[in-house]
């Protein structure tokens, strides 16, 4: 009886959040993807999810083949949703292979039963959505002006609006997912993942909303923020100051980092070590933090695909009684 009462309470809270965010359910269009696609499991697409915070974008929801509406599922939210499942549909012919990795790990009973929510990026706004806003606000005037000038050159309205992007996920998308599908809603069953700038926003999400996200995976984290690794680039150090002030408790949160050694990833090593120092200072240990180097790996989806099983297992490891 208590379980039913809690579910009813949660249902009405979620509906209220959707109502408050002005996201009417009848304005959301969904459909199953073509079953002939090379996908392990099934994908339902939400076409241009409406939002008062960000530009509408597609959202792909992956379900395991044996999905059962009578069960409840953990949820993994992932950035760059159009790059996750099908290399035939991506701009560079690469993919993360999320469906294959999830299916294999679930079949081997290595993961909690989980659905994956792939949030597409809007390319022209990707940097603005993914760059941590409080980090930007803490930069000195010279750096902020330079970054805003960079955005204007690309015809972007602003360099950063990631606080609104997280509001979209937390107050619009997640409530919709939770009232539409049989999900477990606690932080311990809600994880977030991304790569490069998508790693930055995933890390920012667990810091800003520790009551929502219990775990984050950050692959090839773009610590330098832009494409400049000059000594005058203060972004990495402002990020670490932010982490020192805002990392969630390691008692009930865990964070995964990794990086390669080739192409853009070759720039990350010194900053990754600083991040590890920050987490260790905040009492993160081997149970709550991972930081892995993958020799020879480049900054690309095909390499994140190669190592994806590792962060998935860290975030979603099945609990054995």
State where each predicted segment sits.
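Non-catalytic cap/lid and distal C-terminal segments of serine-dependent acyl enzymes
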Residues: 22-321
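Bacterial N-terminal signal peptides
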Residues: 9-16
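Bacterial N-terminal signal peptides that target proteins for export
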Residues: 1-8
């Amino acid at each position: 009886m208590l379980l039913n009462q809690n579910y009813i309470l949660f249902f009405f809270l979620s509906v209220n959040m959707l109502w408050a965010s002005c996201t009417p359910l009848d304005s959301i269009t969904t459909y199953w993807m073509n079953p002939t696609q090379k996908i392990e499991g099934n994908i339902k697409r939400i076409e241009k999810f409406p939002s008062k915070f960000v530009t509408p974008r597609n959202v792909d929801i992956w379900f395991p083949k044996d999905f059962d509406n009578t069960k409840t599922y953990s949820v993994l939210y992932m950035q760059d949703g159009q790059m996750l499942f099908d290399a035939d549909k991506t701009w560079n012919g690469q993919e993360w292979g999320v469906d294959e990795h999830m299916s294999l790990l679930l079949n081997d009973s290595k993961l909690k039963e989980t659905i994956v929510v792939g949030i597409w990026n809007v390319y022209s706004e990707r940097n603005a959505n993914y760059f941590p806003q409080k980090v930007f606000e803490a930069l000195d005037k010279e750096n902020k002006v330079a970054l805003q000038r960079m955005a204007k050159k690309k015809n972007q309205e602003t360099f950063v609006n990631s606080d609104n992007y997280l509001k979209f996920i937390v107050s619009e998308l997640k409530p919709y997912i939770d009232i539409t599908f049989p999900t477990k809603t606690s932080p311990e069953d809600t994880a977030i993942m991304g790569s490069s700038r998508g790693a930055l926003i995933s890390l920012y999400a667990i810091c800003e909303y520790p009551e929502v996200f219990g775990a984050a995976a950050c692959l090839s984290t773009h610590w330098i923020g832009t494409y400049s690794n000059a000594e005058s680039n203060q972004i990495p150090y402002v990020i670490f100051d932010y982490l020192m002030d805002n990392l969630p408790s390691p008692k009930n949160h865990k964070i995964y980092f990794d990086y390669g050694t080739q192409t853009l990833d070759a720039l990350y090593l010194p900053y990754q070590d600083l991040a590890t120092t920050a987490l260790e200072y905040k009492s993160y240990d081997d149970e709550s933090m991972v930081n892995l180097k993958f020799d020879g790996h480049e900054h690309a989806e095909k390499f994140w695909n190669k190592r994806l099983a590792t962060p998935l297992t860290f975030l979603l490891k099945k609990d054995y009684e």
